Amino acid sequence: MLGKRKRVVLTIKDKLDIIKKLEEGISFKKLSVVYGIGESTVRDIKKNKERIINYANSSDPTSGVSKRKSMKSSTYEELDRVMIEWFNQQKTDGIPVSGTICAKQAKFFFDALGMEGDFNASSGWLTRFKQRHGIPKAAGKGTKLKGDETAAREFCGSFQEFVEKENLQPEQIYGADQTGLFWKCLPSRTLTLETDQSTSGCRSSRERIIIMCCANATGLHKLNLCVVGKAKKPRAFKGTDLSNLPVTYYSQKGAWIEQSVFRQWFEKYFVPQVQKHLKSKGLLEKAVLLLDFPPARPNEEMLSSDDGRIIVKYLPPNVTSLIQPMSQGVLATVKRYYRAGLLQKYMDEGNDPKIFWKNLTVLDAIYEVSRAWNMVKSSTITKAWKKLFPGNEENSGMNIDEGAILAANLATVLQNTEECEHVDIENIDQWFDSRSSDSSCQVLTDSESAEDQTKAAEQKPSSKSRKTELNPEKHISHKAALEWTENLLDYLEQQDDMLLSDKLVLRRLRTIIRKKQKIQNNKNH
């Protein structure tokens, strides 16, 4: 008589592996033998595939799914969502979070969300919260996290071995990272008026977008910026085809890129763009994307191209400041160029500071930050990879001296601009420092975070708002566009100070519009 089979409890990672093997065509029977489980268990895993994947995506990519065996959710799921978002934000900013602080914050959110029940943020709740999200015990001791140099060195060694083993060229190695950008954040004492709170800089998360830069180690393939805002289609986008934007735009309520958005970007944009680029270079369509350690992003196993040749690797916890390529001056350079462009735009328009600030839209910001990203030199990006690839270093790229020159030039121009005479180099230089500028602006207040969760859970559009959303967007005919272009050209011809290049651009646009109009007319006849 056969003995009773020993009960096997699979980890979430085991279940993910089984799901992957099922997709590869391996039979239920074979998997049941390999893992020592019944065929019915394998079938249950397939049945709950979506639930397992969603749970894995919300866990710590390196430890959350490798140890945990159950998928028990929180009693207060809404509170759990806002707490992990808050925790991730504190971690990203290097702000120490102790167990006491975490418990107090949970109690605050519980009250702010207007939740009902007997919740006291006990030590038991805190332990379960950490377990659910794969948060290591050391993360809650209240000491500010510093770069783990030992972990960084070990990862550099293992990553170089991986690159050699897979025979990857720098052209096939990509890095991506995100940062928050307060697109209306203007230098103090320059375009802001101390007596007017409405123009005192960025105090609201509504004036914040997330930008994600992605490029390969050569710096020769810079993908369009990924921009994430709070509104699905901001008012400034009216009449704008999102596919024509110089960036890939997504919307969400959270402070950092959420897993669903990131996965969509990876599968629908990153993979096709990389395949296209490598094909143009005559290289094998095989690549790796290096990311820092964010619990909110999908697990490594869940991110790959259909053929498995384009994959993701995560940096270990707490080494971003040391070896994440995009954090070695690339993101800071983008922000510096953006802010310089913002000031230049103000000076070119010559408007009153308050009018300029009021008229500035998120669409303006998107075009400006896209221009800033395009200005980043390939040598700057190559230099950012030097810690992972020492032999890849170049002695060029934007440095402190170049930044100082840019600040000095702008300060000189501003000092000769009405209402900005009091600006100085120190003021501009401090504003250029992405860390000091961003820290002076509130990232996402506790009340705003709770408010976003409340709106997501409770707010339903009224019949009036639904009716407004159904109104068709403004359509501009070819005839009207051609008429406006003709008028603008007439205007330019009357101006003595207009450049020939500006006139030529409009003439080229007029030709394009005429062709479109001709094609449309032929279709109608």
Curated annotation (Swiss-Prot):
It is found in: Nucleus. Residues 168-385 form the DDE-1 domain. Residues 442-474 are annotated as: Disordered. PROSITE patterns: HTH_CENPB, HTH_PSQ. It holds the Pfam family HTH_Tnp_Tc5. GO terms for molecular function: DNA binding. Residues 67-139 form the HTH CENPB-type domain. SMART domains: CENPB. Belongs to the tigger transposable element derived protein family. This is Tigger transposable element-derived protein 2. It comes from Homo sapiens. The lineage of its organism: Eukaryota, Metazoa, Chordata, Craniata, Vertebrata. The gene is TIGD2.
